[in-house]
């Protein structure tokens, strides 16, 4: 199987998000990379499902809460930006202050 760099990056996000969700299900609080991976994964999948950029920007702030992450993590993540593939092409999705 030959994957392009963009496809490899998406696959790494999926693996990181899966690991983070497993840790979360064990009751562990998420660290910075785990939180970013989950948010990124949910945004990419939302785009694939046909949601709009505006909808994803709003949805991105509801994926994780302060209770889900380690202390200080919300303050470390100011923006999450991902390039997602929508039915009408690739677009940049930016979520400001995603953990509230």
UniProtKB/Swiss-Prot annotation:
It is an enzyme of class 3 (hydrolase). One of its GO terms (molecular function) is nickel cation binding. It is found in: Cytoplasm. Its EC number is 3.5.1.5. InterPro entries: Urease_gamma (IPR012010), Urease_gamma/gamma-beta_su (IPR002026), Urease_gamma_sf (IPR036463), Urease_subunit (IPR050069). Signal peptide: none annotated. Keywords: Cytoplasm, Hydrolase. It catalyses: urea + 2 H2O + H(+) = hydrogencarbonate + 2 NH4(+). Its main location: cytoplasm. It comes from the Bacteria. GO terms for cellular component: cytoplasm. Pathway: Nitrogen metabolism; urea degradation; CO(2) and NH(3) from urea (urease route): step 1/1. One of its GO terms (biological process) is urea catabolic process. Belongs to the urease gamma subunit family. Heterotrimer of UreA (gamma), UreB (beta) and UreC (alpha) subunits. Three heterotrimers associate to form the active enzyme. NCBIfam families: PRK13241.1, urease_gam. This is Urease subunit gamma. The lineage of its organism: Bacteria, Bacillati, Actinomycetota, Actinomycetes, Micrococcales. The gene is ureA.
